[in-house]
Every structure is written in C-alpha cells, then in structure tokens.
C-alpha cells in the first residue's frame, strides 16, 4: 500500500544547464462528478458554481507566471509546445470556461502551431458543448479514463460509465477531429480476474486507440479503499482486490498483448504506435522544463544560475 503523499507544494528543480527554448504546461482541474474508491488525488466533488472561480485563479497564475519566475530566478520560456489538462475531470468544465482558459493561455504564452494539447476526460461526463469547445480551443489529444471495460469492475471502483459509453465517446471525439487518443486501464481493480483483464485488453485493442496507459493499482492509505483494507473490512469490495503478484502478472500480460497489437512500450506505463508517443509525458522523463498551474501542480524549471550540488556526507560515500 502506498504511503500518503506529502502536502502539495510548488517545487523548482534544476533540470540541467542547457538552454531550453520550449516549455510544457500542466494545468490541474480538480473537479470530479464522483470520487473513485482508490483515489487520493487532490480532487473532489464540488458544485459547478466553484468552477468559474477556480478557472479565474488559474488565469491569474498564468498571468503572474513571468513575475513569479523572475522572483524565483528560474528560466520560463514563453514558447509552449505541450499542454496537458489533468485532474480530476477537466471535461466537466463548461464550454465558456474552456474558451476563457485557452484564450488566457494564448495571451501569456506562444503556443507552437503543432503544439500537443491534451485533456484528460472521464467517459460520459462531457458538459453540453464542451467537446466542441475543446476542439475550437485547439485540443488535439484526449486521454480517456476507461480504467476497465468490464462494467461491474468500473462501477465497483466508483466509475460512472459503461463500456458502451466509452465507445460512444470515442466515436464523438473522432467525429470532432480528435483522433490522437489515449485510453487508461488499471490492473488490480476489486473483483478483477485474469479472464476479465483479458476482456478489457481485447476491448482496448479493438478501439484502435494509438496510445494506451496501463497502471498497476496503488492504494493510498487515505483513500476510502485504503482505509477499508487497513481495517480488514469488506466495503468497496476490499476483500476482492487482487494480490500484488496477480496484479504484476496482469501488467506483464498487458505488455505482451499491447506490443503484439503494435503499441510499443516506451516507458513504464505507456504504450504507443510509432510516432504517437505523448510528447508531454516524454518531457517528464527527459527532464525538460514544465510549469504546473493549479491545485497540487508542481514545476520543474532550469535555474538561471546552476544550482550547487549538495555536499556528500562522508558516512554515506
């Protein structure tokens, strides 16, 4: 079981001394329609009336980013080549909020014409008109959090969608011109079996998605499921969570199946057809700079002067 994360704070890391001309931008949208049983992310169920206030604060932070960077003595490239809206459930935002957010982003930063702009979305939770607003704003990649194509597993975990809804969303996204897609799966959901995992892998491959993310379930102690596991209880089907060994075998099977289907593993949890790897995700692995804005977001930016390396303690040398 994973230990609770430290309190969120903005961090600045030395990401190398070479000049970087482009920035990645991560924007946290922490709103959900329901909270998954295993989730301990900085997100929650809030009334729609708070969405606009939150977006206003994010826009303030975008407008103040240059001044903050100058005060912190870090380089903040104005050119942006990747944007990622994570959550939470960013597709809960009303169309006008999506438009306002991207208008402000473009006022403060110079987006490349071919920038990769990703939005995380929960199936079946697009506010009316939001999909059209996303396309109009330039969103060209969507990460759809299916987690399972077996309805009983999804519902047990607190998800609100069905396999049919995932299929409907994929059709509507493609009709809107967004065909650079990722689909998330989680290995280790309560009640998951070898057979049901194969069914989810079959369904994922059948979608033709050019990218997939496969995560092994990690249960935070402070999540509802984590507290139930610690108490030895049965709520949220805690007794049906697969063993660590079973989860590892599911993950290994996913690697085998996805690579056979043409989705090559390019980091621990991500698989893609050649040339369709997530550019924003690669930014993290390549230690390239990014600015995080919003609740629980962090940044990694190059110091204007190289940061001194800490002295090694002789007792540990």
Each predicted region: which residue ranges?
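N-proximal helix/coil linker or "cap" segments that precede and/or mark the start of modular domains
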Residues: 1-6
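C-terminal scaffold of the Radical SAM
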Residues: 9-23, 43-71, 76-317
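Short active-site neighborhood of thiol/selenol oxidoreductases, capturing the structured segment around
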Residues: 25-28
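Local cysteine-cluster metal-coordination motifs and their immediate loop/turn environment
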Residues: 30-43
């Amino acid at each position: 079981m994973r230990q609770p994360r430290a309190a969120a704070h903005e961090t600045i890391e030395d990401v190398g001394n070479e000049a970087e001309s482009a920035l990645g931008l991560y924007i946290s949208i922490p709103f959900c329609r329901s909270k998954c049983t295993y989730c301990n992310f900085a997100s929650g169920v809030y009334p729609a009336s708070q969405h606009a206030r939150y977006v206003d604060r994010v826009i303030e932070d975008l407008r103040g980013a240059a001044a903050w960077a100058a005060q912190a003595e870090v380089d903040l490239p104005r050119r942006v080549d990747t944007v990622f809206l994570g959550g939470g459930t960013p597709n809960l935002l009303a169309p006008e909020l999506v438009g306002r957010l991207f208008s402000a982003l473009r006022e403060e930063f110079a987006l490349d014409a071919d920038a990769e702009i990703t939005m995380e979305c929960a199936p079946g939770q697009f506010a009316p008109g939001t999909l059209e607003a996303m396309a109009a704003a330039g969103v060209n990649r969507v990460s759809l959090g299916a987690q399972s194509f077996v309805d009983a597993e999804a519902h047990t975990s607190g998800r609100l969608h069905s396999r049919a809804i995932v299929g409907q969303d994929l059709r509507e996204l493609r009709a809107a011109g967004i065909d650079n897609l990722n689909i998330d799966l989680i290995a280790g959901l309560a009640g998951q079996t070898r057979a049901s995992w194969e069914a989810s892998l079959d369904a994922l491959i059948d979608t033709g998605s050019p990218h997939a993310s496969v995560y092994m379930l990690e249960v935070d102690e402070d999540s509802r499921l984590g507290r139930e596991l610690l108490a030895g209880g049965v709520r949220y089907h805690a007794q049906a969570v697969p063993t660590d060994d079973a989860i590892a075998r599911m993950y290994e099977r996913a690697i085998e199946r996805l690579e056979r289907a043409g989705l090559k593993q390019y980091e621990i949890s991500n698989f893609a057809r050649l040339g369709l790897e997530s550019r924003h995700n690669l930014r993290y692995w390549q230690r390239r700079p990014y600015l995080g804005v919003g609740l629980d977001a962090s940044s990694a930016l190059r110091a204007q002067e190289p940061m001194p390396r800490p002295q090694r303690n002789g007792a540990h040398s």
